[in-house]
């Protein structure tokens, strides 16, 4: 592993128990999402969705490779807690790239969790910064802190006109989609304002946790301008998948095991159209991770 970049604050104050607890939650979030079944167009325990190049075992290997980096993201966020938030990303990016390299080694070149490395790296660094600043580690604070790390990111990386546009730049210029960068820079509003309250409300009503998570995935698909979907199916594919998810929610969503048949059918339709809502899956990982934060906070005396 590469050394953590030199920074301005001693991060040794973070107890190892806290580092391990937050990192374990982030790792479990990745596993919880991929094992959740059935999911429309996504890899799960039943099939590989619209993907021909990856399987469930790839995601398990990938999550294991990423796990070792999660405490380092937290430590980095703590170690630069006195730096301006705008300066954090430039030091965090090399750690993320090294983590990506480990992911690709573990999966023989398959991109399983690149989006999650970006989001979980930001959120873990935000947790480290908040801890070092003695600020409450809440979902809202974590996401707003991550947003400050990403200030100006969309402008810098999506609006520039390169001779050879990246996929993200092309989708931004053609469809106005900002993808993972835009969601992070805005402080994860789809999660904080919609998915997380929805998931918590379903759990409070006594909904089975897996069914609640599947219902929350539908909510995210219905609202998210998912660049993974748009890159495969264009504006038409994105509109279709959003409408399908919205229709299922209006019909009552995923309330009981009998409703899983609707998801099986949705999955087959996505496979036929070669659509995979990977961006929404990444946001579901964020949602589950943030929903569990209170489990750790008692160790932090919150």
Swiss-Prot record:
Which keywords are on file for this protein? ATP-binding, Nucleotide-binding, Transferase
Q: Which GO terms describe its biological process?
A: prosthetic group biosynthetic process
Q: What is its EC number?
A: 2.4.2.52
Which reaction equations make up its catalytic activity? 3'-dephospho-CoA + ATP = 2'-(5''-triphospho-alpha-D-ribosyl)-3'-dephospho-CoA + adenine
Record has Mitochondrion as a keyword? no
Report which superkingdom the organism of origin falls in: Bacteria
The record's annotation in Pfam families points to: CitG (PF01874)
Query: Where is the chain membrane-spanning?
Result: none
Q: Does the keyword Acetylation apply?
A: no
Q: Which GO terms describe its molecular function?
A: ATP binding; triphosphoribosyl-dephospho-CoA synthase activity
Q: Which PANTHER family match?
A: 2-(5''-TRIPHOSPHORIBOSYL)-3'-DEPHOSPHOCOENZYME-A SYNTHASE (PTHR30201:SF2), TRIPHOSPHORIBOSYL-DEPHOSPHO-COA SYNTHASE (PTHR30201)
- Family according to the record: Belongs to the CitG/MdcB family.
**The protein's name in its UniProt record:** Probable 2-(5''-triphosphoribosyl)-3'-dephosphocoenzyme-A synthase
């Amino acid at each position: 592993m590469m050394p953590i970049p030199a920074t301005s604050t001693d991060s040794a104050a973070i107890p190892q128990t806290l580092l391990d607890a937050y990192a374990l939650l982030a790792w479990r979030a990745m596993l919880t999402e991929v094992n959740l079944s059935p999911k429309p167009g996504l890899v799960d325990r039943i099939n590989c969705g619209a993907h021909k190049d990856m399987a469930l075992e790839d995601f398990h290997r990938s999550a294991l490779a990423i796990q070792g980096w999660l405490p380092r993201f937290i430590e980095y966020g703590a170690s630069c807690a006195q730096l301006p938030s705008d300066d954090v990303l430039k030091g965090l990016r090399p750690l993320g790239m090294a983590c990506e390299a480990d992911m690709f080694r573990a999966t023989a070149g398959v991109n399983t969790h690149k989006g999650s490395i970006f989001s979980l790296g930001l959120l873990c660094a935000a947790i480290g910064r908040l801890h070092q600043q003695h600020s409450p580690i809440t979902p809202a604070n974590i996401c707003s802190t991550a947003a400050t790390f990403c200030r100006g990111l969309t402008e810098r990386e999506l609006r520039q006109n390169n001779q050879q546009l990246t996929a993200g730049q092309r989708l931004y210029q053609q469809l106005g989609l900002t993808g993972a960068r835009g969601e992070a820079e805005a402080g994860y509003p789809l999660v904080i304002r919609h998915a997380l309250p929805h998931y918590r409300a379903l759990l409070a009503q006594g909904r089975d946790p897996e069914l609640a998570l599947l219902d929350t995935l539908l909510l995210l698909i219905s609202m998210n301008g998912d660049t993974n979907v748009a890159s495969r199916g264009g504006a038409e594919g994105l509109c279709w998948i959003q409408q399908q998810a919205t229709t299922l929610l209006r019909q009552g969503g995923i309330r009981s095991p009998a409703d899983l048949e609707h998801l099986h059918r949705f999955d087959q339709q996505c496979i036929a159209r070669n659509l995979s809502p990977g961006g929404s899956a990444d946001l579901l990982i964020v949602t589950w991770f943030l929903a569990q934060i209170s489990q750790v906070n008692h160790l932090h005396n919150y």
